[in-house]
Curated annotation (Swiss-Prot):
TM region(s), chain numbering: 10-30, 64-84, 89-109
GO terms assigned for molecular function: NADH dehydrogenase (ubiquinone) activity; quinone binding
Keywords assigned: Membrane, NAD, NADP, Plastoquinone, Quinone, Thylakoid, Translocase, Transmembrane, Transmembrane helix, Transport
Membrane topology, as annotated: Multi-pass membrane protein
Annotated source species: Prochlorococcus marinus (strain MIT 9515)
InterPro entries: NAD(P)H_OxRDtase_bac/plastid (IPR023043), NADH_UbQ/plastoQ_OxRdtase_su3 (IPR000440), NDAH_ubi_oxred_su3_sf (IPR038430)
Lineage: Bacteria, Bacillati, Cyanobacteriota, Cyanophyceae, Synechococcales
Subunit structure: NDH-1 can be composed of about 15 different subunits; different subcomplexes with different compositions have been identified which probably have different functions.
Gene3D superfamilies, A to Z: NADH:ubiquinone/plastoquinone oxidoreductase, chain 3
Protein name (Swiss-Prot/TrEMBL): NAD(P)H-quinone oxidoreductase subunit 3
Length: 120
């Protein structure tokens, strides 16, 4: 039989990781109510009767703030490993990180100047 020594725990983890979500979905299919009555089709709105339609337009400003947040969140993901390995990387990596931060600061200044961060 094919055997990889030391990988038994990993194989067990993979089996459990695949079995738990499948078991949860199957349990939901068995236990969940089947019928969709009129009251169950209504949109839930803090326990009150829904007012207006469920589809509303959001201001584009929400998307702009979300985009700026994602950009700086990704910056954190890239800078954290660099900060952890800072002592071993040397001067070239430090200069590269400074260039990366400078590009992001320029992008932030551009967004600020264009009014993307203004809430009006």
């Amino acid at each position: 039989m094919f055997s990889l020594p030391g990988y038994e725990y990993f194989l067990g983890f993979l089996i459990i990781a695949a079995a738990v979500p499948i078991l949860a979905l199957v349990t939901n299919l068995i236990v969940a109510p089947k019928g969709r009555t009129g009251e169950r089709k209504l949109t839930y709105e803090s326990g009150m009767e829904p007012i207006g339609g469920a589809w509303i337009q959001f201001n584009i400003r929400y998307y702009m703030f979300a985009l700026v947040f994602v950009i700086f969140d990704v910056e954190t993901v890239f800078l954290y490993p660099w900060a952890v390995a800072f002592n071993r990387l040397g001067l070239l990596a430090f200069i590269e990180a400074l260039i990366f931060i400078a590009i992001l600061v320029i992008a932030l200044a551009y967004a600020w100047r264009k009014g993307a961060l203004e809430w009006s």
